[in-house]
C-alpha cells in the first residue's frame, strides 16, 4: 500500500511504470491469505475502485487462490474464476469487478486492442519467478497497458538471470518472509 500512496518521486515513477514490487514469502507461509489481506486493505484504505486480476500458471493454484477468496467471503468462485480467454476479455472490458481469477495461459492470443485501459487494475502474479515472461506475459501487458503489477513468489531465484527478470517486470522486493524468519 505504501508504494501506491508514496509521495517519493522514484517510487511514483516505479508505480507509474506498473511495477509495485515482489512479495517473497516462503512456501507454506500463507501467500494466498496475504493476497486477500493486501487486496482488501487496498480497497479499504486507498480506493474501492480497484480491480485485482490474480494470475497463476497452474489450475491447482488458480483453484486454491479463488477458493481462499471465496472461503473468506470476498468473491464467488463461480462468477469470478475465468474459464476462457474470451470470458477474460469480456470481464476486463466490462468495468469494475473487484476480483478476477485467471491463468496466464488465457493470454494466449495476440492482443490487437487492449482489454482495458483503466489505471486502477492491479495484476497479482503468483509464482512470479516463473511463466510471467515471454509471449503470454507480453500479451497480458498489452491487454492491460495501464495496469500495475505485483509479484508473489515462494521460490525466488537469487542472483540469477531469472531473478533480474522478475525485478525488471515487477520491481524490487517489498516484503520478505523467508524460511529463516518462518522457523524463528
Question: Where are the model-predicted features located?
Answer:
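RecA-like P-loop NTPase motor core of helicase/translocase proteins
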Residues: 1-184
